[in-house]
Amino acid sequence: MKGMQSEYDFLNLSQNHAVKSNITRDEEIQFTDKINKKDNYFWAQERNIIITNKAIYNLKKFQLKIRIDIKALIGITISKNSDDFVLHCKDLDYDYHFSSPRRKIILDILSNNYKAIFSQELKLFELPEKNLKEYVTTKEEKEKQNSYTRMPKNANTLNIKDYLFGNQSKTEINKNQSNIKLKHKFQNIK
């Protein structure tokens, strides 16, 4: 797929030279979009996100704020009642709290990349809370104990593919909250 634009490059960044200069040569852009990052006070801040086969890039406009290596992920918590999700990370300063109407696409890409690296499924937790702030490990908590995590221990653990697709091989995703439908085909579902 190198040199080709991903069907999920919603911001058309795969051909942007300034953006590509932040990404290593062996990375493929698989997803780009606007996303809401929740700050320490849980206010939404608009960010651009890039997901490659190796990392997640959080950009403010087009300036790189953080690169999260896929290898740093230890799990993802999602809300059953909102588009919120938390990326639980090891060896980083804190967890990352995001919200996106395209959360299912993001989860699919991240889980496929994680499985390609570790040959195992990424942990997925689903909670009824609309706001997941209680499950975000803060910088202060990590400074006290680097291995500390607020990742749920007694929550409903889901098989990520079952959550994403059930028994379906296709799902329709509303693109840009309009009437334009994007058919998303998934491979190797199990």
Roles of regions detected by a PLM:
Residues 170-188:
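Long eukaryotic intrinsically disordered, low-complexity acidic serine/threonine/proline-rich tail regions
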Residues 1-48:
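Anionic N-terminal interaction surfaces
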Residues 1, 187-190:
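A positional/structural detector of protein chain ends, strongest at the extreme C-terminus
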Residues 6, 147-149, 169-171, 178:
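Intrinsically disordered, low-complexity serine/threonine-rich segments
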Residues 34-84, 88-104, 166:
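Phosphoinositide-binding peripheral membrane targeting modules
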Residues 82-163:
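Eukaryotic regulatory low-complexity N-terminal regions enriched in Ser/Thr, Pro, acidic
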Residues 9-11, 35, 136, 164, ...:
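Intrinsically disordered, low-complexity regions of eukaryotic proteins
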Residues 13-16, 21, 47, 54, ...:
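Intrinsically disordered, low-complexity proline-rich segments enriched in Ser/Thr
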